[in-house]
Amino acid sequence: MTKKRTVKRKVKEPEPTKEQPSVSEQSENEEDEDLLQAVKDPGEDTTDDEGIDQEYQSDSSEDLEFESDEEGNYLGRKVSNEAEEGEDDQDEDDDEDEDEGEDEDDDSDDDSEESDANEASATPKDDQPSSSKAAAAQTKEPIIQIIPRDPSKPEYEESDTSDEEDIRNTVGNIPMHWYDEYKHIGYDWDAKKIIKPPKGDQIDDFLRKIEDPNFWRTVKDPMTGQEVLLTDEDIALIKRVNSSRIPNPEHDEYAPWIEWFTSEVEKMPIKNVPDHKRSFLPSVSEKKKVSRMVHALKMGWMKTTEEVEREKQQKRGPKFYMLWETDTGREHMRRIHDPVSAPKRDLPGHAESYNPPPEYLFDEKETKEWLKLKDEPHKRKLHFMPQKYKSLRAVPAYSRYLRERFLRCLDLYLCPRAKRVKLNIDAEYLIPKLPSPRDLQPFPTVESLVYRGHTDLVRSVSVEPKGEYLVSGSDDKTVKIWEIATGRCIRTIETNDVVRCVAWCPNAKLSIIAVATGSRLLLINPKVGDKLLIKKTDDLLAESPNLDIIESERIKTAVQWSNAEPDEQEKGVRVVITHFKPIRQVTWHGRGDYLATVMPEGANRSALIHQLSKRRSQIPFSKSKGLIQCVLFHPVKPCFFVATQHNIRIYDLVKQELIKKLLTNSKWISGMSIHPKGDNLLVSTYDKKMLWFDLDLSTKPYQTMRLHRNAVRSVAFHLRYPLFASGSDDQAVIVSHGMVYNDLLQNPLIVPLKKLQTHEKRDEFGVLDVTWHPVQPWVFSTGADCTIRLYT
Amino acid sequence: MRRPKKYEAGEATQYISRRAALRKLQLSLNDFRRLCILKGVYPREPKHRRRAQKGSSEIKILYHTKDIRFLLHEPIVWTLRDYKIFAKKSGRDRAIKDFRNLKRRLALFPEIKLDHIVKERYPTFIDALKDLDDCLTLLFLFSTFPSLHLIPREQSNLCRRLTIEFLHYVIASKSLRKVFISIKGYYFQAEIKGQKVTWIVPHYYPFKPQSRQEVDFKVMSIFVEFYTIMLGFTNYRLYHGLNLAYPPQFPSSMLQDNEETLKDETSFVSERIAALNFELLRTDKVQEDEEEPDIDMELLEQDGDSKRIIKMKQEAQEIARLRNLFKGLKFFINREVPREPLVIIIRSFGGKVSWDSSVFSGSTYDESDETITHQIVDRPSLSTQYISRDYIQPQWVFDCVNQRQLLPTNKYFLGEELPPHLSPFVDAKRDTYVPPEEKALHDPSLIETHAQSDDESDEEEAAQNEDDTVDQELLDAQLQRAYQQETAEYKKYGGPDGVNEDEEDTDDDFDGEQESDEEEEELDEKTKRLQEEKKKMSVQSGKVHKVNKRQLHKAEVDEHRLQARMVKPRHRNLFRKLIREKQSKEKEEWLLRKKRRNIDNDTKEAKKLVKREAKKAAAAAAAAASQLGVK
């Protein structure tokens, strides 16, 4: 009771100061309250101002009571009742509180009183001590506590009362901050606003903290905004809860155990009924089940867990057995079509060793190159970088090992396979087996003489039939006659134009050279050798035979025969045949009576045949079959070879018809030469090739030789020896063996023998012409370097 | 008659593109890949791609139509389809959490059976042996793998088992022929039933996480799936051929995948090696110590002795020797040496091997065993050494096997700089360059000269020629002085006449050189005259015709070059290609030779320098000493 008083005082003390401003606002409420008060307690008008405060005070006191209820204190309530009874003056406030509630309050009050009465009746002894001191009562509470709780009624009432006291504010269980912006904090039972108590500022709080010794136990009630002073019991309760003990201080944790149900097994049955028979007998159905299982186990239909486990173990992993009965025995089975086994990987060389010989290790340059080809590793010389380790222990795992294995796997299943015949032959094998040149001697092997004297490139060269003298025609407009054995220039004959071609008459009884210079063909008596022969030739050429045949206009316009002018006569020129176009080539028939000339620009009159004895010319072709390159007489038969750019045509001069057309399959023919027996033709072309035609065999070349590295200018057969030579722009003269057998079944044998390369290069030209000595195995070549060379 | 359309016959019908094949087989690409790998079906290169692809010229993957039709009848295609069904159904069970059903389904997982495929791909046993290279290499790699997402533990365990079984066979049959330490791994070559089987064992530890683009383990795993089956059957037959029990029984609990070995990689490896060090159980009790007599040999003797047969005979004898190369030798492997390859090699050539029992299991004798003949060490020095044994580096074992003889160990001693390790697989046709070390091996005479030139002659020459000129002069001067003193003493005390005369002569020489010169001139004139007379009189001795070799060679080359131009036109391109290849090869060879020459010169120079410096230092020390002595 002392505590209650203190509470009242405490609350009262701060209130007056704050209340005054709010009085005017709440005047209406006050009036209502006044009315009520008037009904209930008319005597206490004086305390009008503090009515609200008192209400709150009472409220707090009721709270206390409620709390005490919670603690199971019946006493607190009784005390209050007693206080009402005993000390009216003091506890008027309480009464007022109760009065201010609704009518029900009264009832509840009554109930509580009744309950009090009941309690009193139940515990007659307790009444007396409760009046003394709460502290003293507390000690006795545990005993009291049990008794009132057993019957439900007082408890219910208690809760009822607590309810009634508790609900001062009728807003319910809502967050109280909703009222933060309002002056009131809710509504009481009479639907009147409960005004918030005034708030002190921090200084006030601080002052109170200093001054008030009970400040620490003052708590604010959120529902009403009132400050509540906690009692000692409250604090004790809080402490207990905080220390997680049972809130009721009276609860005895160490109370003696009461054994409601015994743990001992009783010997005698509780019930007096005997057990059924089937509790003694084994179950028939189970027996059946078990016997079935036993049977299943016996028969192997069912397996024990152990067996199952063992089987599983065995089942795991593949089973191996003798798949192949013998090593090589083959059972007929379907296989994939045409199997191609994958090739094995290359085995490692020295470079892959962990400790290779030092030359295999990369030096800086090689390393750089290797690293440079990072993006195209297939171009690398080695797919790894050779490395040297001092000891086996230091060798690390190869970083690309997995990748290599994976690539091999990809190869095996993704790489298209095909069977290919791989040639595993030596390059030597492809070279045809030919006899050694040493067995095919004689043939020219060394350069023995150089004929110097011309000042421009020497176009053509020809040898006297007896083999003593040599004639050459050059671009410096001269024809020079040389003595072969000494290399001396015997005579120089100047002409008016570039000498394209010179040809010594093959008839040994005549001493005539045909010289093609510009568009004129000069027949020159060289005046060397046998004097008789010279004289005879001069005589022969001096008299012109009388022409009884009238030539056609076509020939007349093309060719004019005339005797040479006196000044030319001195030089040795005997007859001049003037053509209408520049002559490129002149060639003699074997007997020395006929000669043919070629004028490439002459269109359909580009080839002409002249007869010396009759001083007559013919045009064998009426139609142009192409750009004629060169012409040739057959050594034996009356045949005429005409080489156009691509093809060679062979004409019969007697029948005047085309015998054969040889297909060269080359772009540009440069020259040709016929074997002295007349069955084989050698053709040189500007596209580096030489073609050997066997005229009896086919119109296609028997053999194509690519001996030269550049355009072949000329070819020549030896008259006696089985030799032929070719001169080319690569400054080489190549001497080859070209044996033609009398046996028709045997193919000609062609063996390149010697490459003679002494000419110098000048303006892309090398060797321009080659000619054989008529008797000796000597070859003459003329070159762009203004020299004629003799190889023996 | 209907006019045939284009691409209805011929090459176009022979090939089928992969897309079409997939459609025909009704398989996904993954399943098709798996099927192809297992069945050994591979794409084909058509003769005319354009025709085979029905006119399109882009490069497609083409299969033989017959192959695809063959796949159509393959029973495992159904298993592959069952997988799909299984995945669908078990996925459903999992989704609706029907675990009872799921468990039942898992027990019924469709197993793929590959036995018939092995037989079909390799109709004879020899065929299987021919294709063993890739199989072994891949399985050896997989046997070192940890458990991966795509490679189940069971698979790598199976690989381990099978490879060890194979190694046991190699050891038992003594069929190992060549070994090689490469930077990629250890190459082994065995000759099994006349087939050369080569495999690579990678250096530890080969596994590294790989990106998907680099390495697809799934593909490799499928290969391994087939190869394990194949190797299993091969092993079975090989073991039975040797009268060995299969699966092999090992003493103790080798090869049991107990938890410990799986957990610990090192113990895993050590168990693997330990298993190799035990004899296998034989089905027949007869110990097959004696060599089976070679039937071939007898036959050969009957046949007579053509060159080839003699060669074969030699080869057979050599191999017989090789098989017992290490017989009677006891090896001990130090713990830093990679043991697996060494154990295989030593055991398969008849040696005994052991290692430190405290570190690895499976050792048979201790280091302190006095009967050990060789201890293999791979560190620069060893604290405790026994006199009774050779301490060698592991390369010795490899080189011995490749040379087929026990090499002298001096070059392989502890801490010695090793001679280069040469590959036994070089093909004389492929690699024309032969390093000097290999030349020396073929020709024992070269060894000595090489060694001599290396060690003695060169250095001495150098020393005499260049280094010691100063020293030599000094020495000579000293000697001469000593000699003069001696002669002077001799004069003083008198001696035999002959000696005196000699001295006079020498004195003359010293004093009157001019006189002697004059005399000589006179003599010369006389002789000249005489000679001239003689020349007139006598027949001159003929001069030997000197052949200019270089010119001759040039002529030959020219000749050959000309003849080479006579190659038939249809062979010309091929000829050119061959020549180009030859030239590049020659160039390579030349480069290597040049490099080697430079290196040798450099090392020689370095040696000389070292020696010279040493000598100089010695001379300086000697001079200092002599000076001290004089003082």
Swiss-Prot record, chain A:
Subcellular location: Nucleus, Nucleolus; Nucleus, Nucleoplasm
InterPro entries, sorted: BOP1/Erb1, BOP1_N_dom, WD40/YVTN_repeat-like_dom_sf, WD40_repeat_CS, WD40_repeat_dom_sf, WD40_rpt
SMART domains, A to Z: BOP1NT, WD40
Compositionally biased intervals (Acidic residues): 44-53, 60-72, 82-117, 157-166
One Pfam family per UniProt: WD40
Residue spans of biased composition, Basic residues class: 1-11
WD repeats: 453-494, 496-534, 578-620, 623-661, 664-703, 707-746, 762-792
Statement: the UniProt record of this protein carries the keyword Repeat: yes
MF terms (GO), sorted A to Z: ribonucleoprotein complex binding
SUPFAM superfamilies with a match to the protein in the record: WD40 repeat-like
Gene Ontology BP terms: maturation of 5.8S rRNA from tricistronic rRNA transcript (SSU-rRNA, 5.8S rRNA, LSU-rRNA); maturation of LSU-rRNA from tricistronic rRNA transcript (SSU-rRNA, 5.8S rRNA, LSU-rRNA); regulation of hemocyte proliferation
Keywords for this protein: Nucleus, Repeat, Ribosome biogenesis, rRNA processing, WD repeat
Source domain of life: Eukaryota
UniProt GO cellular component terms: nucleoplasm; PeBoW complex; preribosome, large subunit precursor
Residue ranges, annotated region (Disordered): 1-167
Family of this protein: Belongs to the WD repeat BOP1/ERB1 family.
HAMAP family assigned to the protein according to its UniProt record, in alphabetical order: BOP1
PANTHER family for this protein: RIBOSOME BIOGENESIS PROTEIN BOP1, RIBOSOME BIOGENESIS PROTEIN BOP1 BLOCK OF PROLIFERATION 1 PROTEIN
Cited function: Required for maturation of ribosomal RNAs and formation of the large ribosomal subunit.
Protein name in the entry: Ribosome biogenesis protein BOP1 homolog
Protein species of origin: Drosophila mojavensis (Fruit fly)
Curated annotation (Swiss-Prot), chain B:
Any coiled-coil regions, as ranges: 510-541
Residues of the BRCT domain: 321-414
Positions where Phosphoserine occurs in the chain: S453, S457
Region (Disordered): 450-469, 489-569
Recorded GO CC terms: nucleolus; nucleoplasm; PeBoW complex; preribosome, large subunit precursor
Locations listed in the record: Nucleus, Nucleolus; Nucleus, Nucleoplasm
Compositional bias ranges of the Basic and acidic residues kind: 525-536, 553-562
Bias (Acidic residues) ranges: 454-469, 499-524
Biased composition (Basic residues): 543-552
InterPro entries: BRCT_dom, BRCT_dom_sf, PES
GO terms assigned for molecular function: ribonucleoprotein complex binding; RNA binding
Alphabetically ordered keywords of this record: Coiled coil, Nucleus, Phosphoprotein, Ribosome biogenesis, rRNA processing
GO biological process per UniProt: maturation of 5.8S rRNA from tricistronic rRNA transcript (SSU-rRNA, 5.8S rRNA, LSU-rRNA); maturation of LSU-rRNA from tricistronic rRNA transcript (SSU-rRNA, 5.8S rRNA, LSU-rRNA)
Primary location recorded for the protein, binned into one broad class: nucleus
Function: Required for maturation of ribosomal RNAs and formation of the large ribosomal subunit.
Family under the similarity heading: Belongs to the pescadillo family.
Protein name in UniProt: Pescadillo homolog
Source organism (scientific name): Drosophila mojavensis (Fruit fly)
